[in-house]
Amino acid sequence: MYFEIEKQAIDAISDALDKFEVDNTLENFQVEDEKNFRLEFPPNPDMGDLASTIAFSLAKKLRKAPNLIASEIVEKLEIPEIFEKVEAIGPYVNFFIDYSNFSKKLLEYVGKDYGHLPKADEKIILEHTSANPNGPLHIGHVRNSIFGDSLNRLLKVAGREVETQYYVNDMGRQIAIIVFGITELGLKIEDQEGDKIDHKIGRLYFKANQKLNEDESLVSHVDNLIERYEGGAEPELNKIFEEVVESCLLGIKETLHRININHDDFVWEGQFVRSGEVDDMIKYFDHEGFVSYGDVTYIDLTCFQIEKEFVLRRSDGTSLYSTRDLAYHRYKATQGDVVLDILGSDHKLAAQQINVIFKEILREIPPEVIFYEFITLPSGSMSTRKGVFVSVDELVDEAVKRAADEIKSRNPDLTDEEIKPMAEDIGVGAIRFFIAKLSPEKHLTFKWDEALSFERGCASIQYAHARACKLLKKSGKDVSSLAVSDDWVPNENEKDLIRTIAKFPQVIEDCANKKRIHNITQYCQDLAGAFNKFYKAEQVIGSDVEDTRLVLVDRAKTTLKNALDILGVPAPQKM
């Protein structure tokens, strides 16, 4: 619906430009060029519902001030029926929607899939989370998971085909340290502290790592395990490695599932060694003359302005994570049209190396990377290596507990059984929303008072959805059978809500094109705010336009739920 009225506005301006008589100065100007011809949402409804900046693009060609050009465009423009008026406000051409005409059409258009864009002929392989399976997910990982999953949801709504992958580091040193703890120190996973198996494995890893720090002579034992597992010739050893990884992944998947995250595929890095793909790739580099030999086998990247060499093999002949990662990226490139990685900012050098190797040596399209800064609690950052971390499980438990306490204080008559599901929805929603609301490039400190605020946080948005559900239920009517009155002329509160609902598809398109999700959180806040303003000011049940307003409430509820779904935030029907 939004794109329809946008097209009408663009066509109207295009027709107006055709009427210009300026000695062929517009001869080479293409009005279809999106870079020169775009519409925006004005910051204030008093300035209209849509605005064009085309006067800026024409100023140099016409050698006129943009505000004069905007006025000329408006003079020559024929106003489409969907608009009440068009005005030149400064250098902008501003369109004002005729809400007596538009509102009924919009409310009839909005359905359960509202916001979903047409299918695009593009498949994206999106890798996110990919934490080492040597312990539970901690708060340092969770921004990757939440951003990656929300981006996956956004891109799917925007019409892209997306496959999410978790890259499993089964050949990493961390797993070998755990196997060392089991096979040589006699440690047992089941004997460790923790309610979940990933926590038990994390404790075992910590103990084994401590032992290695105390006795450096044991480090060679870990090196030996890495070499033997990579060789793949010992079924019993392979089984121990694989059971450790699979067990830890069970716990990690459980954590991810609790915060509404699931992956389509888990790809083990070992498969690229066992299949010979890593060896074949190194042989190719060698054949092309890019491999250097010394203590290690490496590619010298200084000719590509990267000082640090890209190591392919250790002195003992084993491959590195970076080598296997390169093979994995080549594999991903065969699975889709776009390869998209979500990586912490500490991976920038490695990503730069991969980028150069793909472009300059392999002559292939490199992966697209979105970097994020790390998230901390006010007390500081965390590390699994030192055994001092706040796990995602603990973070969610704390969020749910705080939410339950707040619900209880506001609703003392509710039972614990009634509170439990609401607290889970609010706690999970608070974490996901708070982390999603900031651009990934910015450092984020997790603040409980902001995240769980029932006035400003995600809970206030969830409450708007629950409030709409309660109102519809209270009406006792089947909203699907209700019709919008033909003579309904919306007031200012209704207009504001309709205007906000109408923006949703454009917000989806903009965010998907930029591959960023934080503006979805802002949209949720705007929509919840517009609904709450309407709810407080306008009578619905018992009003002269009861059916129409019930339809408006239902469409606001649907849009808000769809927006929250993109963020992976529950939309409770009761709070």
Swiss-Prot record:
Its main location: cytoplasm. GO terms for molecular function: arginine-tRNA ligase activity; ATP binding. Its EC number is 6.1.1.19. Keywords: Aminoacyl-tRNA synthetase, ATP-binding, Cytoplasm, Ligase, Nucleotide-binding, Protein biosynthesis. GO terms for biological process: arginyl-tRNA aminoacylation. It catalyses: tRNA(Arg) + L-arginine + ATP = L-arginyl-tRNA(Arg) + AMP + diphosphate. A motif ('HIGH' region) lies at residues 131-141. One of its GO terms (cellular component) is cytoplasm. It is found in: Cytoplasm. It is an enzyme of class 6 (ligase). InterPro entries: aa-tRNA-synth_I_CS (IPR001412), Arg-tRNA-ligase (IPR001278), Arg-tRNA-synth_N (IPR005148), Arg-tRNA-synth_N_sf (IPR036695), ArgRS_core (IPR035684), DALR_anticod-bd (IPR008909), Rossmann-like_a/b/a_fold (IPR014729), tRNAsynth_Ia_anticodon-bd (IPR009080). Belongs to the class-I aminoacyl-tRNA synthetase family. This is Arginine--tRNA ligase. It comes from Methanobrevibacter smithii (strain ATCC 35061 / DSM 861 / OCM 144 / PS).
